[in-house]
């Protein structure tokens, strides 16, 4: 698996900040914890939270810090044992904490509030949707690469794997294995 280039991650953060400024003027902080959005911004999926402010972005990792550092070209990755550490770093809490409300659970929002004591939750769902709507050159290249993997596995390899007596489960396992060996995330 090839790491997402640092320049791509930085461009995504810059676009996020610009859209937040347009849609939520005066915003102070956004918290990303959903794995897909986390991968989009950091290039890795670990347990923790990405906290984005207009002036900085820090990826706080609870587990697998070393893995995060090895997989990601994100500029600021820090270990944390508890959200208390991240909250202490920032000092005062923002009035509105922006989260991905379509994905954030009420339990997670309550836990975040316990440590950051913000007054209300705001949604950056529309920002994320707008951001991911237009693909970068890197994203288009990755889509083409993914398509090539699928084409090879489904058009070239799958016909060779199919034989009398193979179960659907066994075929799925073998196809999945072929995809992952070629760089698919599965």
What are these regions (language model features)?
Residues 1-59, 94, 155:
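Terminal domain-start leader segments
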Residues 8, 85-185:
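Flexible, acidic/His-enriched mid-domain "rim/lid" segments that flank
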Residues 23-26, 182-186:
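Short secondary-structure junctions
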Residues 35-36, 61-67, 103-108:
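Short, polar loop motifs at secondary-structure junctions
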Residues 43-45, 72, 109-112:
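Short amphipathic alpha-helical segments
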Residues 53, 72-75, 115-117:
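Short, structured coil segments at secondary-structure junctions
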Residues 54, 63, 80-83, 101, ...:
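Residues at the C-termini of beta-strands that transition into short coil/loop
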Residues 60-88:
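Compact, glycine/acidic-enriched structural inserts
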